Amino acid sequence: MSDTFEPIRIVALYHFTPFEDPAALRGPLLELCEKEGIKGILLLAREGINGTIAGTDEGMERVMAHIRALPGCADLESKDSRAPELPFRRMKVRLKKEIVTMGEPDIDPRQGVGRYVAPEDWNALISDPDTILIDTRNDYEVAIGTFKGAEDPKTKSFREFPEWFRRRRQELEAKGRLPKIAMFCTGGIRCEKSTSFARAEGVDEVYHLKGGILKYLETVPEEESLWEGECFVFDQRVSVKHGLEIGTHDVCHACRRPLNEKDKASPLFVQGVSCPHCHNERTEEQRHRYAERERQEALAQARRAGHLGVRQK
């Protein structure tokens, strides 16, 4: 991590626990977040809570105490990092059917998941030639970084993962292989469902990285790491590197995909409007709408900067 003081605390969290009435939890949680100046997004569903929030240490302490006091959440999984400024612009608490959408209603991680592997033990597992390593994230996330030797399912959404996994398993069985399966994702939540799904499909020897990529990058020294590239994150940092340092990628405000310097040098890149990944996916009307949104946001930022300048005189 950076030696420079970074005043903002960022917490990525999730927990599978039964909420009888998620809607009743939403109001008090949102009210407290707004009172404490917390920004980010939290998802509530009958199966639990998931999200990433950021704010001052004092505000985050109070909000995290509230979250841990929710039914069954005393031991929720969370990962801390720091930033020089808020990586979110607003606070949202949304009600969902699932806190991570897989589209397999019978899968319940509370009934069993794969075997957790600590970051410091991960290298040994994935270096074993009898281990199949699977990245459970979407294609645009995998594109900017993954573990050496990992299989990329090339999914556009997590809903596509079950079908891909069934096909891949059939391919392995046709070759007479029954390898160990190791899965990983950004913070661990997708692997709670993907390994639970694998077990429901009859796979016994399935493992997943405890704390996800973020915990690995925080824990394992870069010189010992088998991670290649950067890790996409769903906030204004866009990507992080070893030690959870902010990465080098920007994001396309039209499609939310990460962009490197080559992408931004493309003639198809227009700030806030299009990029090489989405230019052919958008209509002229959509691009016009994005351009207007970008203009309005620039005006709003200029007004905020001017207001701050007056206050500092």
Swiss-Prot record:
Active site annotation, chain numbering: C185 (cysteine persulfide intermediate)
Keyword Transport found: no
Leading EC class: oxidoreductase
Classification via Pfam families: Rhodanese, UPF0176_N
NCBIfam families in the cross-refs: PRK00142.1-4
Highest taxon listed in the record's lineage: Bacteria
GO biological process terms held by the UniProt record: tRNA modification
Catalysed reactions, semicolon-separated: uridine(34) in tRNA + AH2 + O2 = 5-hydroxyuridine(34) in tRNA + A + H2O
Source species taxonomy: Bacteria, Pseudomonadati, Pseudomonadota, Alphaproteobacteria, Acetobacterales
Keyword Oxidoreductase: yes
PANTHER family in the record: RHODANESE-LIKE DOMAIN-CONTAINING PROTEIN 7-RELATED, THIOSULFATE SULFURTRANSFERASE/RHODANESE-LIKE DOMAIN-CONTAINING PROTEIN 2
Record EC number: 1.14.-.-
Domain Rhodanese, first and last residues per copy: 127-225
Species this chain originates from: Gluconobacter oxydans (strain 621H) (Gluconobacter suboxydans)
GO molecular function, one term: oxidoreductase activity, acting on paired donors, with incorporation or reduction of molecular oxygen
Protein purpose: Catalyzes oxygen-dependent 5-hydroxyuridine (ho5U) modification at position 34 in tRNAs.
The name this protein goes by in its record: tRNA uridine(34) hydroxylase
Keywords, ordered alphabetically: Oxidoreductase, tRNA processing
Family: Belongs to the TrhO family.
HAMAP family named in the record: TrhO
InterPro entries linked: Rhodanese-like_dom (IPR001763), Rhodanese-like_dom_sf (IPR036873), TrhO (IPR020936), TRHO_N (IPR040503)
